[in-house]
């Protein structure tokens, strides 16, 4: 990335209009295995907690993206963290939002195994009014990590132990998973992941990175094949939380990834109440390794 590109990255994109559609809400809910009736209601369905990650479907072209004018190699782009902060109720079908995206900062770090990682803090804000200057209804923050291609002649990654993202996200404080104290509120195992699951989520969310469904493209990055979209399990975890929290609004939902999930992984979702208004969710692969950890704060 050149210095000119880095400077351009801090120019906010043009705002765009997002009309929340009930068909898209139900599609997203089905793609993320939502057990919540309000997500599939015949009238005025409520958006799932991570639904606004689908905002890219409403972008007309590159001028609406915080990445406008910047080249990205999707073979080497990883998702490190994601956070949603809600300052009001979740949008329902028919809500008209004004959306604006910007890159807040970029910085570099050296990986433990060498090579440079470029971290990008991408912020997407949503307003219910036509303006985009006041406090937003929702703020979505993403940490994206660009890594260097593997060295020439390096063997392709394998699905065991499938730790490809760990080095990349070390700089966002990946820690060993320790069971959180508190009340266990759910413990579920989802069916084994398939590439069809990845494609369904990509269609529902607008994340069309071919690394999640195109074998040749995935292998060109050094991976053995397609792997799960990180936000898929994050959305499933959020839906599990919503089913438990009921009508209590969530103020903040934050996710941090540790390892890739692969086709064939039957992920386990364990939610623990860590305080009067706080939860932690650990999502683990069949071998017990952590795929992601999520934290949520409710308003009551």
Regions found by a protein language model. Give the residues of each.
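Hot-dog-fold acyl-thioester-processing enzymes
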Residues: 1-81, 153-155, 165-247
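HotDog/MaoC-like acyl-thioester-processing domains
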Residues: 1-3, 81, 85-190, 257-300
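Catalytic-pocket segment enriched in acidic/His residues
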Residues: 225-228, 232-267, 272-274, 283-286
